[in-house]
Amino acid sequence: MNKVNICVIGLGGVGGYFGGKLAHTFSSNSDSSANVFFVARGRHLEAIREKGLIVKSPEFGTITCTPTLATERISELPQIDVFLITVKGYDLTEASISMRDRVGEHTLILAPLNGADIQEKLRITVQGGIILPSCVYISSYIEKPGVIQTGKPGKIIFGKDPLHPDDTPYELFRLFQKSSIDYEWKEDANPAIWEKYIFIASFSLISAYYNRTLGEILEKPSLKKEVIAIMNEIKSIASKKKIQLPDEIVDLSVKKATLFPPDTQTSLQRDLSQKKDKSELDLFGGTILYLGKEVGISTPTTGKIYQELEKISSSLGTPEVSG
């Protein structure tokens, strides 16, 4: 039986957790039915090469995960059977172009990023393989180079590729089960993806624009109103695209925010407030505007916030909040 070749591109909080569990199962231990390759860069890659990837979690304590190979160049790898792409949205195009030569007809591709149209973007650049729409729920981050700290067990939700409706990835189920990865398989994963997107995009845009935590947004009626307006714009787009969401999805999404610590910041908020060179602003605001235009849905609140955030990202300041 041939080994399954698994490649994890991006070893941040998400890739480090799921990739770490895969490597710990198949590369670090006696199970030799799969090779697990890591694609990373910089000091993080150097630390992984030197000491392995260390993953710390209340779920399993501390484990050291040694991949078959950790590299910066996908060109060094063999043909890949399973790609797990866990880069930031702004690095997706570069990652997908770099992996094209390692994608075969039956290669499985999961990219559980925060966007609503990730599979469509991948389809344009990869032009092959079986792309399984997916999203994740996890709290995890790089504590320092080579070390991942996680909270509760992460979960990945994925479903069938619309272009390959007869293909069910039973081998991937086996890999996840052996690695104790919590997953949920759906015939159609798009509702789950959009349910997450409606929450994360709206709160990301408002938190970044006003530089306010989730708790502060919920406490201020004016900010909460804008969050709900963006949610309704996304909901209308989803409806036009025949994505089946619960009628009460907006209320459910607002209630979900109350489950987070009040001082929670979004990653977009942190990136813009820290004036980082790159952010996922386009993944949230830009995507809503583009998809709204595509299906004929007006997105005035998103449009206003997105334009102002582009100014903020150019270091023009943060607006005052009233109400």
Locate the predicted segments by residue.
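Internal alpha-helical scaffold of NAD(P)-dependent oxidoreductase catalytic cores
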Residues: 26, 101-102, 125-130, 145-196, ...
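Short, charged/polar "capping" segments at the starts of alpha-helices
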Residues: 44-47, 119-120, 166
